[in-house]
């Protein structure tokens, strides 16, 4: 009988130990699952942050005026030069691209036409706003092909090269502005095959 009673006690102790081990195992499993859930949430946040960053970079790239706007050669570069009208030194805020009258001018990036009209000195002119602080300006156009408020896509024809305003021959006066400050347009052309003749 002592043997039988001991066996029952041993069986009971083993069963309690097994239940305790199962409870510990379930407790550890629960903790591991909670930790895994926290890690998944952190990774999801990181993935979301990376996705948002890449989306912003893509939008910025689409807004960057990286396409050369017309065929021709650069007849006057950005920076210091002598004015063709006064003979005095001046800062040229863009580049002049000499081309035959009627040569298509294309949008260098997606954007919205924020000015389409006539300006003193520049004749028929356009301003495109691209986002991320970028704007581009086109002067001496023969004819504007787009209207104020119109959305344009990179590569779309927006005007034709002309000789309007104060001009010594058919050309496009092209400016790139970042936060309303003029920058050398040549610095934004990313396709080497697109680089203009200098």
Regions found by a protein language model. Give the residues of each.
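Catalytic cores of peptidoglycan-degrading enzymes
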Residues: 66-198
């Amino acid at each position: 009988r002592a043997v039988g009673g001991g066996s029952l006690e041993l069986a009971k102790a083993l069963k309690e130990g097994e239940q305790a081990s199962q409870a510990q195992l379930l407790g550890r499993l629960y903790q591991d699952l909670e930790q895994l859930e926290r890690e998944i949430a952190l990774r999801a946040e990181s993935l979301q942050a990376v996705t948002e960053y890449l989306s912003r970079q893509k939008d910025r790239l689409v807004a960057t005026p990286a396409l050369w706007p017309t065929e021709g050669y650069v007849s006057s570069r950005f920076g210091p030069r002598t004015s063709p009208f006064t003979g005095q030194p001046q800062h040229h805020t863009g580049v002049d691209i000499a081309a035959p009258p009627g040569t298509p001018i294309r949008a260098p990036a997606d954007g919205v036409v924020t000015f389409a009209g006539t300006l003193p000195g520049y004749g028929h002119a356009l301003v495109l706003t691209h986002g991320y602080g970028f704007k581009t300006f086109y002067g001496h156009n023969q004819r504007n092909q787009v209207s104020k408020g119109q959305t344009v896509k990179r590569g779309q024809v927006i005007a034709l090269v002309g000789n309007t305003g104060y001009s010594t021959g058919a050309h496009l006066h092209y400016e790139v502005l970042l936060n309303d400050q003029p920058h050398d347009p040549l610095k934004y052309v990313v396709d080497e095959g697109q680089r203009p003749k200098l």
